[in-house]
């Protein structure tokens, strides 16, 4: 454990604009050291909340709840064993007993959080669903949602409301669909917990930024999401400007005149299909999708005033081009 390094990294994140800092908390020693990190930051005038990220060991979450403002737990490995890709079979009674095991371990943790005024994040990951969930639901958005809902129902029954939810995947299509499905399921059961958005393993550089913008941006445009994290394989402070740009873009759309909506009867919000369009030469209809590049302003006059042929590349074949 390097307390000083953690404090310095947290300061860089906060100075870049981070509104809270998440720290990986592998074991009990690391959880107890959150106290020292908190003291180190507060002594230098930083009062930004700390979030402990806990996997595999519920005891670590119990300790972390005493020193962090929020604790993230992963339903895929909080009580259920880590993922081994075993196919498990349960009777209805046996499955209900597995849920009771979760209740028996989770409720004492909630009580510790109540005593210490600690919030929790129920953070589901597509890549770490338990064997129990995988065996019952498969590797599906429905399984991810149910993994989260099992814990939310316990929170509701125990009148614990200081909860944030995240439900992430590295595949942006899966991530967007799953969050939308989760919101729908919460509405069915009268729940309205805040959402934390993010794309796992987005990568670095331009690719990581584009991937995060696609997943997070689509949901923000839906009006979903309360906090976000752009996960880049770079220094953590590099994530903040990207997140800020996404939020600022959405905020520019605030305050516009109300536009009454009209439901499209053929449109499935959770599983949108390709829209039917009229073909204009080789675009639309049953033609393959084409990619049209945005032209830099400095070159647009040159291109339009010349006799250059404009090409549009078809996505499917790398070396295939068509002229329009």
What does each model-identified segment do?
Residues 1, 19-23, 48-54, 71-73, ...:
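Hydrophobic faces of well-ordered beta-strands that scaffold small-molecule active sites
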Residues 5, 14-41, 75-97, 163-172, ...:
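Glycine-rich, proline-tolerant flexible connector loops at the mouths of alpha/beta enzymes
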Residues 92-102, 133-284:
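Catalytic alpha/beta core domains of metabolic enzymes, predominantly
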Residues 1-8, 26, 48-57, 132-145, ...:
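Active-site mouth loops of central-metabolism enzymes
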Residues 25-67, 299-301, 319-320:
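N-terminal active-site wall of soluble small-molecule enzyme domains
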Residues 30-52, 100-117, 146, 150, ...:
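Alpha-helix-loop-beta-strand connector modules within alpha/beta enzyme cores
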Residues 26-28, 53-59, 74-78, 123-129, ...:
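Active-site beta-loop-alpha junctions enriched in small/polar residues
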Residues 44-45, 68-105, 132-143:
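Glycine-rich tight-turn/loop motif centered on a GG-T
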